[in-house]
Amino acid sequence: VQTCALPIFTEGDTAEIYVYNELDEETSLHWHGLFLPNKEDGVPYLTQMPIKPHTTHLYRFPIIQHGTHWYHSHSGLQEQIGMYGSFIINKRADDPTFRKGIDDLPAIPVILSEWTDYKPGNVHRMLHNASDWFAIKKNTTQSYFEAIKLGYFKTKVTNEWKRMLAMDVSDVYYDKFLINGHNESQLSQFKGGDKVRLRVSNGGASSYFWLTYAGGKITV
């Protein structure tokens, strides 16, 4: 899996982003959390026509904010197979809120996500069918024995009749969890004692991530 290109801008810039669609299907890109003209928002058949296969599309909009954002395909289930990436907007150096020693630290974009070897269309179908398969893969199914033991046999039968199985918060089993499109990341350009600024986005389809740092507290 490879995430898409990494746009880095400074507040006050004008973004010009050319999308070359080399797919055999339509696509589009949505700029998550960005303030921009409606026609550049990237929702096919609503704010723009989809980008046809083997054509080029230009997104052009002013950058009027700063922060850590991300972008993703808004067509079909393309986001679930890796069409997403970080979108970083730096503060201007003359911004009165610019913090020396923080905003000028080396920045590392980190986009977290997940990966399943199942085709996204199959995942979508299995969720609609309320299958127990993903729960079985994660060893989180509730057996009839457990339901009887805990006094919830009637509830379990009623829920199954309603096709409301005992799913957890994230109903999909993932084969890998990714950082910038890989299952691990090495930052060999830094040494012990260096300070860096992580620009973190959650590009996952259904996963929550809890971040810890072996060296102590993370300043947010």
Model-derived regions, located:
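Extracellular/periplasmic metallocenter environments
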Residues: 23-26, 34-36, 45-97, 105
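Histidine- and aromatic-rich segments of cupredoxin/plastocyanin-like copper-binding domains
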Residues: 39-52, 148-220
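Surface-exposed loops/turns
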Residues: 9-11, 53, 65-66, 191-192
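Polar, glycine-rich mid-to-C-terminal structural blocks
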Residues: 112, 118-172
